[in-house]
Amino acid sequence: MADHSTVNGSEIPVYNLKCIDLANPDVHQSAAVLKQACMESGIFYVINHGLSEELMNEFFGQMKKFFALPMDEKKKLFWNQSLRGYRPPAQAVIDNKTQQKDFGEAYHIGVDVAKDDPNCGKFFYGPNIWPPADILPGWKETMMRYQEETINVGRAIGRIIALALDLNVDFFDQPEILGNKTASYSNMFHYGVPGTDFSKEIVGAPPHCDLNFITLLATDEIWGLQICREKNAQPQLWEAIPPVKGAFIVNVGDMLEMLSNGAFRSILHRVVFGKERYSTGLFLCPSHDYVIECLPTCKSEDNPPKYPTIKTGDYILSRFRQLAADTVKDNKAV
C-alpha cells in the first residue's frame, strides 16, 4: 500500500499488486511470487503475456464501436439463457440503499458450442451471438482471436498455479479444466452510459467474488477496480487497484479457492467509477462435468477438506440461484 486514489473527492488507499512476468525463465520463482500473492490477496498483475499491443488496441476499438451503436441495434442481440449477447443498462438495482440502477452495459461471448451439443443452453454454453458483419466488419474475428489468445495466457498462468500448489505443471491442462472442454467465457463492459451523473460516486459492479477458476481483466487505464482483502470483516476496507498499461489483472475465483482448500483466496471486489470506463474480463471456468474437490496436495490429516465436493455445473447453478434469492430478499427489505 503506497498512496491514495481519489474517486469523486473520496480518498481510498491504493494496493500495489505483485507482478508475474510470463517471460521469466525461472518458473519456480514465478510460482513462489504467485503463491504469496494468492495467499495474501488473491489478485496480481501478469505482464509479458504475449498478446500484442496491436491486438489489445484493436479489441478495445471494436468493443467501443459496438457500444456506440444505436440502442435499437444493440437490443437485437439481447442476451439469452446461455449468457451470450448484449445486456443493456438498468437491468437491475445494484445498490438497494440508494436504489441505484446499473449504469453499465455488457456484451458476453464464450467458447462456441453447436446447437446440437448436449451442453448447449446451459450457463456459459451455446453458440455466440454476433453483430452483422455489414454493421461491424471484422468484429467477430477480433473478438474470437482475443478470446482464444487470452485463454492461452490463462493456461500459462494455470501452469504456474499448478507449481505453486505442488502439482504437476500440466495438471490444469486437463480437457475438463482448462483444456478443450472448458466453459470459459468473456464479458465486455462499458461503464457510464449516456445520462450518467458523474458528479457522485457510482457503483458499476457491486461487491462480489467471481465464481470461476481465475479471471483475466484488461482495462482502458481508467481507475475503477477496488478490492477488499478481508471479505468477512466489518466494516469493509476498500483499496484501489491501479490499471497498468498492457498488463492483465488476474484474480482468484471461488473454484480455485475450493480446490486449494482455502489456501488461495477468492477476492471480494467491486467497480466504482467517476468517468466513462471500458474493461473486459476472461473468466476461466472448467466444464460443467468437472468435479471440484480439494486437491491432493492441499489436504492432510491436520488440514482436512473445508469445502464439499461438487460438480462445476451444480456450483454455477447454486450461485445463480443464491444471487436471485438475495436480489428478492434485498428488494423486499427496501
UniProtKB/Swiss-Prot annotation:
Q: Which cofactor does it need?
A: Fe(2+)
| SUPFAM superfamilies documented for this protein | Clavaminate synthase-like
What GO biological process term is on the record, naming one? biosynthetic process
Tell me which tissues or organs this protein is expressed in.
Expressed in maturing fruits and in juice vesicles.
Stored Gene3D superfamilies:
B-lactam Antibiotic, Isopenicillin N Synthase, Chain
Protein's UniProt keywords contain Oxidoreductase: yes
Can you give the residue ranges of the Fe2OG dioxygenase domain?
Answer: 181-286
Query: Where along the chain is Fe cation bound?
Result: 208, 210, 269
**Which UniProt keywords are given for this protein, alphabetically ordered?**
Dioxygenase, Iron, Metal-binding, Oxidoreductase
> Pfam families given for it?
2OG-FeII_Oxy (PF03171), DIOX_N (PF14226)
**Which of the seven top EC classes does this enzyme belong to?**
oxidoreductase
**Can the keyword Transcription regulation be found in this entry's annotation?**
no
- What's noted on cofactor binding? Binds 1 Fe(2+) ion per subunit.
Positions bound to 2-oxoglutarate: 277
What pathway or pathways are given for this protein in its record? Answer: Secondary metabolite biosynthesis; terpenoid biosynthesis
Give the molecular function GO annotations. Answer: dioxygenase activity; metal ion binding
User: Could you tell me what reaction this enzyme catalyses?
Assistant: (1R,2R,3S,8R,10R,11R,15S,16S)-3-(acetyloxy)-15-(1-hydroxy-4-oxobutan-2-yl)-2,7,7,11,16-pentamethyl-5-oxo-6-oxatetracyclo[9.7.0.0(2,8).0(12,16)]octadec-12-en-10-yl acetate + 2-oxoglutarate + O2 = kihadalactone A + succinate + CO2 + 2 H2O
Write the Enzyme Commission number(s) for this entry.
Answer: 1.14.11.-
Q: Which family does it belong to?
A: Belongs to the iron/ascorbate-dependent oxidoreductase family.
PANTHER family per the record? Answer: 2-OXOGLUTARATE (2OG) AND FE(II)-DEPENDENT OXYGENASE SUPERFAMILY PROTEIN, OXIDOREDUCTASE, 2OG-FE II OXYGENASE FAMILY PROTEIN
Outline what the protein does. Answer: 2-oxoglutarate-Fe(II) type oxidoreductase involved in the biosynthesis of limonoids triterpene natural products such as limonin, a compound with insecticidal activity responsible for the bitter taste in citrus. Catalyzes the formation of kihadalactone A.
The name on file for this protein is Kihadalactone A synthase LFS
Please report the organism this UniProt entry assigns to the protein.
Citrus sinensis
